[in-house]
Regions:
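A conserved beta-strand-loop-helix scaffold within acyl/acetyltransferase catalytic domains
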Residues: 6-70, 98-119, 128-284, 295-306, ...
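Segments forming glycine/polar-rich beta-alpha architectures that bind adenosine-containing cofactors
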Residues: 69-72, 78-83
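Contiguous alpha-helical scaffold segments within structured protein domains
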Residues: 287-291
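Long, low-complexity, intrinsically disordered segments
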Residues: 362-369
Length: 369
């Protein structure tokens, strides 16, 4: 694809351009990592920024004064140049650009003079063939799996969405039950629930269902990571009555199956709002804000981090990089993209209403995992 100058592509334009879609998919197939393929990406970052020369793309979202790059797909050696294109594009529009990336690329940007503030962690089982429940480090995981297995007839099996309407309805009902226990959910959950209910799961996704005595306890969606010969644990749904160890049982069975298939790695996904200790490269104002929100349990996902750590993954920190002169107040826009990625709150405020719209910021909605 020939694109000499950097280019912003809106979601609607992307949906009407098959050539651009093919170009993006080719980049994901060759270079894409977890945030590029995650189900939440289509909601959190529905637009596209194409770098100069079309060497790479960022999946992006924006607010009136802010650009947020959720994921990059392209060659590693082109990342710094693509990031520079995005920072330059944003500056011309008097916008503040923010780029979410793992530590190696964030350190690269810090070396170029940008700040890189801790925002979370990526957790991976890098060598699936060597994964085992044996050893003292796996004692807690073994205990929880064993606790679940004490219930009779526990099994995890892959299900092809659409192959049985009754099962599709049961899975959709499980998603509804899971939603009922959450204060807030991202819009991508409802979008995905609709696809499950209609039996239209995306081709790169696989669905695994775990039953206990014939009752559905949880559903796990994994998404293919073609560039790594791996899979991402993308979405997990479970009911209130699921006993201790239900998710651990399901994940261990999925890992066992994937290893037999020759899959190389398994990612437990990104966990935002954890492991945000101060570092030399951070924007101290943003770091202080995030740690305050973490202490107040507004932006805190420590429990999810600890859950995934039972599988003894490799953990790589995630950072948000931005210009050193960027106003710290603008970082609230990044948090609001997580809380309201489709900007529905602003739409409600602009629409005529019988009662005044609230302006109280919502707590960030962390992708389910």
């Amino acid at each position: 694809m020939e694109t000499r100058a950097p280019r912003w592509v809106e979601r609607d334009e992307l949906n009407r351009d098959p050539a651009m879609q093919d170009f993006v998919q080719s980049l994901i197939a060759r270079f894409g990592r977890e945030l590029s393929v995650a189900v939440a990406r289509s909601s959190l970052a529905p637009h596209l920024f194409v770098s100069r020369g079309a060497h790479g793309v960022f999946f992006v979202n924006r607010r009136p004064n802010t650009v947020f790059a959720f994921a990059y797909a392209g060659p590693d050696e082109r990342f710094a140049g693509a990031a520079g294109d995005l920072f330059e594009y944003a500056a011309r529009g008097k916008l503040v650009a923010n780029i979410l990336e793992e530590e190696p690329k964030a350190k690269e940007l810090a070396g170029l003079g940008y700040t890189s503030t801790p925002f979370g962690v990526m957790q991976r089982v890098p060598r699936l063939a060597g994964f085992s429940l044996e050893g003292t480090k796996m004692r807690r995981l073994r205990y929880q799996i064993g606790h679940y297995e004490k219930h009779e007839r526990c099994e995890t099996r892959e299900y092809r969405a659409g192959s049985d309407p009754a099962t599709d309805r049961t899975v959709a009902a499980l998603v509804d039950a899971w939603k009922a226990g959450k204060k807030q959910i991202g819009p991508y959950v409802d979008h995905f629930r609709g696809r499950i209910a209609s039996g239209e799961l995306p081709g790169d996704c696989r669905l695994f269902l775990t039953y206990r005595n014939g009752e559905l306890d949880n559903a796990i969606v994994i998404s293919r990571l073609p560039a790594a010969n791996g899979y991402l644990m993308d979405l997990e749904f479970y009911g209130a009555e699921m006993p201790l160890g239900g998710l651990e049982f399901a994940i261990s069975r999925i890992l066992e199956l994937l290893a037999k298939e020759g899959v190389s790695c398994f990612s437990l996904g990104a966990t935002f709002g954890t492991q945000m200790e101060a570092c030399a490269e951070e924007d101290p104002r943003v770091g202080k804000m995030l740690r305050g929100l973490h202490t107040a349990r507004i932006f805190n996902n420590d429990g999810n981090f600890q859950f995934k750590n039972k599988f003894r993954p490799e953990n790589t920190r995630l950072f948000v990089s931005r210009s050193r002169d960027a106003p710290s107040a603008s970082f609230t826009d990044v948090l609001m993209i997580f809380a309201d990625p489709e900007n529905r709150r602003q739409s409600r405020q602009e629409a005529p209403a019988s009662a005044p719209a609230t302006t109280t910021p919502a707590a960030p909605v962390l992708p389910p995992s």
